């Protein structure tokens, strides 16, 4: 086994291409370069003692960044001055969308027993109940119902974050401050 040194940007790209836990850097590169496993390329690569090794944890940096972003929100001055749960709720939703819009879109399909919680227009929320008090989530194309109690808002954020694959620790912290 040879080792090579790669810059940080290339390392992150290779790590992001991991398809399953335990996949080696050789497997990833072979797949990306479409080289069959049997074919041996004769390439001379200088050996350097401190190469970067792609591991099963390499792809987790994205998740750490998401957690860092949420923690940064929770300790921000802008968040701290929100006097009401609705303000904190809207900031959290806006941040979740900004951090991972694709994950948010997928997760926003959650519904209650009788209500739709999120929609891309006010009318869809009003159709599920005239007293839903829909509000646009800042800096997103989404609307959310707001005439729920604080516990229901926590449940909505909890369900959203679970579907977006956040870990339990950050979900509890975020829901605890609504």
Curated annotation (Swiss-Prot):
Specify where the region named Interaction with DNA lies, as residue ranges.
113-117
NCBIfam families, alphabetized: PRK11187.1
Q: What does this protein do?
A: Negative regulator of replication initiation, which contributes to regulation of DNA replication and ensures that replication initiation occurs exactly once per chromosome per cell cycle. Binds to pairs of hemimethylated GATC sequences in the oriC region, thus preventing assembly of replication proteins and re-initiation at newly replicated origins. Repression is relieved when the region becomes fully methylated.
- Residues of the signal sequence? none
Question: By what name is this protein known?
Answer: Negative modulator of initiation of replication
S-S bonds: none
Subcellular localization(s) per the UniProt record: Cytoplasm
Q: Which family does it belong to?
A: Belongs to the SeqA family.
Pfam entry (one): SeqA
Protein species of origin: Photobacterium profundum (strain SS9)
Q: Which gene encodes it?
A: seqA
The answer, when asked if Acetylation is one of the entry's keywords, is no
Kindly list the GO molecular function terms attached to this UniProt entry.
Answer: DNA binding
Q: Name one GO cellular component term.
A: cytoplasm
Q: Name one GO biological process term.
A: regulation of DNA-templated transcription
């Amino acid at each position: 086994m040879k080792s090579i040194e790669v810059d940080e940007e290339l390392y992150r790209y290779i790590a992001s291409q991991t398809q399953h836990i335990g996949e080696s850097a050789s497997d990833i590169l072979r797949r990306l370069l479409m080289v069959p496993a049997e074919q041996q390329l004769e390439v001379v690569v200088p050996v350097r003692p401190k190469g970067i090794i792609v591991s099963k944890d390499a792809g987790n940096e994205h998740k750490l960044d998401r957690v860092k972003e949420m923690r940064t929100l929770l300790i921000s001055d802008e968040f701290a001055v929100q006097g009401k749960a609705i303000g904190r709720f809207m900031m959290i939703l806006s941040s979740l969308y900004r951090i991972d819009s694709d994950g948010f879109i997928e997760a926003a399909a959650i519904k209650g027993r009788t209500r739709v919680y999120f929609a891309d227009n006010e009318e869809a929320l009003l159709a599920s109940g005239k007293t839903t008090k829909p509000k646009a989530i800042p800096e997103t194309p989404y609307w959310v119902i707001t005439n729920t109690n604080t516990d229901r808002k926590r449940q909505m954020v909890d369900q959203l974050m679970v579907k977006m694959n956040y870990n339990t620790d950050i979900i509890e912290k975020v829901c605890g401050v609504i």
